[in-house]
């Protein structure tokens, strides 16, 4: 049996004319977090991702939020996806697949992950409210598009039921954390879970 070393960590920095982001991720953490994105709603959602996924996340971001939250949200998704990919390396010995149903009061979402090196996002979670606090609800999809592209994951997000936009998005972030934690669990075999021998 192959034992995956519990030291899957990464650190990514990204600076553009629009954002300046530093992120540290520990996939074998305990849900510890220190998050300051400048976007209060996104802080809340990423905290939930960290806690419910047992992932340690340190994140500081400065962006052009005087314009809107788009660049900051998308670029954090880019950096988080890169951090996941870096921490996992060749993805050898992990479960690779995971699916989670997660409720939040009346909201129920399904998150399915394949850490396949084939980036793809299916997103079907309509939120009626255009704003969640001051946060544009359409940015949730842009965030997960960036994460999936940079992490090299196939990611399906579906809302089964839901009325309250905050509940729907909260369930998505919690569910993503839980699904990711399951997909990276040790499988007990060497190499990638693929008939090709690699991903």
Swiss-Prot record:
Broadest EC class assigned to this enzyme: lyase
Keywords: Amino-acid biosynthesis, Cytoplasm, Histidine biosynthesis, Lyase
Alphabetized PROSITE patterns for the sequence: IGP_DEHYDRATASE_1, IGP_DEHYDRATASE_2
Enzyme Commission number(s) of this protein: 4.2.1.19
GO BP: L-histidine biosynthetic process
Pathway assigned to this chain's UniProt record: Amino-acid biosynthesis; L-histidine biosynthesis; L-histidine from 5-phospho-alpha-D-ribose 1-diphosphate: step 6/9
Catalytic activity: D-erythro-1-(imidazol-4-yl)glycerol 3-phosphate = 3-(imidazol-4-yl)-2-oxopropyl phosphate + H2O
Source superkingdom: Bacteria
Pfam families on file: IGPD
GO molecular function term, any single one: imidazoleglycerol-phosphate dehydratase activity
GO cellular component: cytoplasm
UniProt-annotated location(s): Cytoplasm
Similarity section: Belongs to the imidazoleglycerol-phosphate dehydratase family.
Protein name as annotated: Imidazoleglycerol-phosphate dehydratase
